[in-house]
Amino acid sequence: MSERGLLIVFSGPSGVGKGTVRQEIFSKSDHKFEYSVSMTTRAQRPGEVDGKDYFFRSREEFEELIRNGQMLEYAEYVGNYYGTPLAYVNETLDKGIDVFLEIEVQGALQVKKKVPDAVFIFLTPPDLNELEERLVGRGTDSEEVIAQRIERAREEIALMSEYDYTIVNDEVPLAAERVKRVIEAEHFRVERVIGHYRNMISDKRLSDK
């Protein structure tokens, strides 16, 4: 049975450990996902490879893709565009490969409007106190910035109902395993495979044998 890949949208508050969990998933040889390559208008840095680290495009090229509806989601940050090219995602999914998109909540909501049958997974901390401890432990943000991130986390957690699944990141290996189990189960949802079986039972050649 030929099956199109799944678009997996993975997000959660800043500091919850999205990148760490994603790295844990991709560190295992048994995963069958491809990490989504983002597009940006920022300058290519030494050692970066176009098409691997990012798709590097000019501002004019990026804005033309926006006008033509060819960006799955995008945002402007510090004067540069960042986003997910729709053509790349569709080409990968058409090969039967799942695409793993780690993204902020607002970007995920953009994706949901365009690809409602994607799998939306929200990663949460055990509680906000632990999230604050993780942010403090980074040692990169001031108290003011941490307070802003906690407030934003409250707002993002309030949008959890827009997602299909929530995974608690209490331990990274366990959280990664839960994510993989969710994706595996999604491949067996009736609505994803029923078309194949409808075609199978309507094939009159079977009754002629």
UniProtKB/Swiss-Prot annotation:
It comes from Streptococcus thermophilus (strain ATCC BAA-250 / LMG 18311). It comes from the Bacteria. Keywords: ATP-binding, Cytoplasm, Kinase, Nucleotide-binding, Transferase. It is found in: Cytoplasm. This is Guanylate kinase. Pfam families: Guanylate_kin. The keyword Transmembrane helix does not apply. Residues 5-184 form the Guanylate kinase-like domain. InterPro entries: GK/Ca_channel_bsu, Guanylate_kin-like_dom, Guanylate_kinase, Guanylate_kinase_CS, P-loop_NTPase. GO terms for molecular function: ATP binding; guanylate kinase activity.
